[in-house]
Amino acid sequence: NKNDSTNNYVTFTTKFGSIYNEFVPLEEFKMKKVPHGVAHFLEHKVFVQKEGLQPEEFFSKSGALCNAYTTFKNTTYLFSGPNNLKENILYLLDYVQEPYFTEENVESEKGIITQEIHMCDDNPTDVLYEYIRKNSFYNNPFKDSIIGTTNDINKITKDILYECYNTFY
């Protein structure tokens, strides 16, 4: 129907947010600590596919928009659009469940996320929010930034990403 204005909104959420930087990895028995910002970094890297269309290209060609976001407790991948619901859902499931991390693409992402951190540091509202949060949650995992610090980001490797992915996804 030409007058149908239905817009589909589909999400894929995993319970891996920024507060989960200490955990027992899958098939291991000892607690491990990873740098802050890993969940957000992983969110960025899941958008990179080994071959074929990248998510932004695929969804754009089908008339949909895609995005992702990380919170303290979750990471969500999503798309919205009026057409091709089945194909879009299948693609969302495929790209989120087929990670592709290399030392090269992890290193290049560090620069992108570092720029994101600097943008937040240049925004007075973000700076105030970070200050209030750090002081309000002094002894709580919510005190740490979702995106991490530049020091945290520089410690992230493809092995850390795969370990977190395999544990939480």
What are these regions (language model features)?
Residues 1-54, 165-169:
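His/Glu-rich zincin catalytic helix
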Residues 45, 49-169:
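Charge-rich, well-structured scaffold segments of protease-associated domains
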